[in-house]
Amino acid sequence: MNKLKILLHVILFTILTVSVVFAAENGFKAKLTGNDEVPSVKTKAKGEIKFKLSNDGKELSFKLHVKNIKNATAAHIHSGAYGKSGPPLANLFTGPKKEGKFSGDLAEGTITAKDLSGDLMGKTLDDLVQFIKSGETYVNVHTDANPNGEIRGQLK
């Protein structure tokens, strides 16, 4: 009976470990703040974005949640290491502009290969995923007051 209990614990531990590893490999996120913008921006706004890759690797779903953002105009995934700016690779939010102060889900959707732009135009979604895993991508939210970006976070 004790051997069976131990075996069940080992199996359960293995399943949980594999599930956590699988989730980490198929999910990406970032915390967005003004301090991470280049140059940094003094703002009370902040945000969080979460991505999940489909099992077949053809869709990357996302949800972008923000707090205290004012007059948000756009949000993108950009290429660029921490502290460096780069061009957009995919649109996350393109309007209509959120007038006034806003807290809530700014954007939610799915990215596929046809949504890629800039250096990744015509490439596969796996190319974007590899770029994210390399640490060379960030998300930022643009506003009227800060058209180059008010809050930013490096994807991990």
Task: Describe each region flagged by the PLM.
Residues 1-11:
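Bacterial N-terminal signal peptides that target proteins for export
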Residues 9-19:
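Bacterial N-terminal signal peptides
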Residues 19-75, 79-156:
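Metal-centered catalytic cores of metalloenzymes
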